[in-house]
């Protein structure tokens, strides 16, 4: 992929695990593996399960695979899909400590908190940053991970040799909806802050299409491209 990563200085952000009590309800049918993630999930029905919500689209934190391995976990609501990544391994450790079966549920980012509050999942492990607004509706654990945000541009971009975020003044910059990847853009003076998109793959696609000059992405995810 003809991308270049520049500037790992936007923001050092703590990535936290959200934990709340389990709920009850009905179960939804499985999705096709190629279908987009739904914003709802099967409700928690068995206390023997530890149900974790994530996007399964955010490597290396969490992503989706099509074949079982010794380390990935089946995605309950996507037929033939398996979740892998750092967040999945954290979830496995927690499930083992709790003595419960780990169940991974694929959800869109903006559906995670609602699913947690409705009792459809027991936890969000998806690189969600602790904010005052989110604390109004969910609880957070201690940090399990730290990350640094970066700017990603295409190779050959006029911004390729930028050394400061202020070098992106006048640039059209894109972030992910409902995340700090979008919120931090306003730190850049004179920036053209584009309407955010729903996922990191969507941001990458927009960058490749040339509809933005740069995207905000954390360093570890940028290294996957």
What are the roles of these predicted feature ranges?
Residues 51-59, 140-162:
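Hydrophobic/proline-rich hinge and linker segments of small-molecule sensing/allosteric domains
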Residues 21-34:
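Bacterial lipoprotein signal-peptidase II cleavage site
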Residues 71-72, 154-172:
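Flexible hinge/capping segments at coil-to-helix
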Residues 32, 44-128, 136:
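Extracytoplasmic small-molecule ligand-binding "clamshell" domains
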Residues 110-111, 127-137, 184-187, 208-225:
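A ligand-binding cleft/hinge motif common to bilobed small-molecule-binding domains
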Residues 120, 132-147, 190-192, 225:
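Ligand-binding "clamshell"
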Residues 86-88, 103-114, 160, 195-209:
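Short helix-initiation/N-cap motifs at beta->coil->alpha
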Residues 99-101, 117-126, 171-172, 208-221:
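Alpha-to-beta junction loops
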């Amino acid at each position: 992929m003809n991308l270049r990563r520049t500037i790992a200085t936007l923001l050092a952000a703590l990535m936290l695990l959200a934990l709340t009590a389990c709920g009850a309800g009905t179960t939804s049918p499985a999705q096709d593996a190629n279908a987009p993630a739904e914003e709802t999930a099967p409700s928690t029905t068995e206390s023997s399960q530890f149900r974790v919500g994530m996007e399964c689209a955010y490597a290396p934190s969490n992503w989706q695979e099509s074949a079982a391995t010794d380390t990935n976990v089946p995605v309950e609501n996507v037929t033939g899909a398996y979740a892998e990544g750092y967040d999945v391994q954290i979830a496995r450790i927690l499930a083992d400590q709790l003595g419960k079966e780990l169940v991974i549920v694929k959800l869109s980012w903006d559906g995670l908190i609602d699913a947690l509050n409705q009792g459809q999942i027991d936890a969000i492990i998806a690189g969600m940053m602790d904010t005052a607004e989110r604390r109004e509706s969910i609880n957070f654990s201690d940090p399990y991970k730290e990350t640094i945000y970066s700017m990603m541009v295409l190779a050959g971009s006029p911004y390729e040799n930028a050394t400061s975020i202020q070098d992106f003044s006048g640039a059209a910059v894109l972030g992910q909806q409902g995340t700090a990847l979008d919120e931090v853009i306003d730190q850049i003076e004179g920036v053209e802050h584009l309407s955010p998109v729903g996922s990191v793959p969507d941001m990458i696609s927009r960058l490749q299409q040339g509809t933005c000059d740069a995207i905000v992405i954390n360093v570890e995810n940028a290294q996957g491209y």
